[in-house]
Amino acid sequence: MIKMAMHRLSNKGVHEKIGYVYLSDTPGGLLLEAELEGLPPGDHGFHVHEYGDIEPGKNKKGKVIAGGAAGQHLDPARTGKHLGPYRNGHLGDLPYIIVEDDGTCDDAVLAPRLMLEDVEGLALIVHECGDNYSDYPLPNGGGKSRIAGGIISNDCPYCKKERNRNLMILGTVAAGVYAFKKL
């Protein structure tokens, strides 16, 4: 089982943690259990991407996009087809997740064509909109922007950066309090 942290994404970078996704192998495929908060209500595309990076990156047109360094949907067979989780298109196509009106998501999806060994170290992305599992009328199911993501690993590099930043802030505050008391 992997417990991975998910973070808010923008074209400026990787931001605060918004929850976790738990991944585990089952006889029916890879089970992904999302516990997220702070997302817009509604359906959201949910995909494994080809690289293990969620920093901003350039798309094919050269525009910097949120989570662009994750690359495209995982598609090792190079099908080039967006057919959803149950057909033979992108392997990274997952069932969409549903966010409640209060911005929380407590949803579980099953990816029958995947196992942990297929995805460990890669990026998991939540898209702004739902997914119709087609490239019509919009590419990649119409999911639009990448709004959240994480690296499929128990060892979150972004959590370490956040923890180190918080420790630096705490140390600075503590030093300031000590200096103030000395006055």
Residue ranges and their predicted role:
Residues 1-183:
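N-terminal leader/targeting pre-sequences
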